[in-house]
């Protein structure tokens, strides 16, 4: 049986980060350690333009403090967009996010699926599954098979949310009407 580890941390910085005198992104791991947390989600929701060098520096600071890092990909990703160009651009955004989190030493990118727009949920789901397959192939082709794409849902009526139907064997826990948490084993952190 697989061993599971629950990690806790914020997505981005809270008001207490600056209230406690912290100012720089590289201080996030120290802040999290002081707060007794062991994870963080680096926010690129409005677009991420972090260099590989800065990402690696942030990741090293996180490992030094035993902080597991994931990354939230841009909100404008649309896995179920009816315009093929938007879906293909979404794959590029996923690749950019994957490169950044990989440089940080993380393995997970959080991705919103987008909305159903003017098509049925079934059509949107088919498009999203196709886009996810293309995104996974792009990750594999680039040597980033270690990166997990983690779909996140928002509980909005027009959002595509039936991920559990797509991945019925994935262990999960329905924590609210707003999200599915995919429970996976997380490897031990190393200072390497």
Where are these regions (language model features)?
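Active-site-proximal loop/turn and secondary-structure-junction residues that shape catalytic pockets
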Residues: 14-16, 44-48, 73-77, 113-117, ...
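Alpha-helix capping/termination and helix-coil
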Residues: 173-174, 186, 190
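Charged, low-complexity C-terminal accessory regions
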Residues: 1-4, 156, 177, 185
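Non-cysteine beta-strand/loop elements that form the S-adenosyl-L-methionine
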Residues: 67-71, 177-182
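Active-site acidic/histidine proton-transfer and metal-coordination neighborhood
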Residues: 64, 80-177
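A short alpha/beta connector and helix-capping loop motif
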Residues: 167, 189-192
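N-terminal pre-domain/capping segments
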Residues: 1-96
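Alpha-helix capping and helix-coil boundary motifs
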Residues: 16-24, 117-120, 191-192
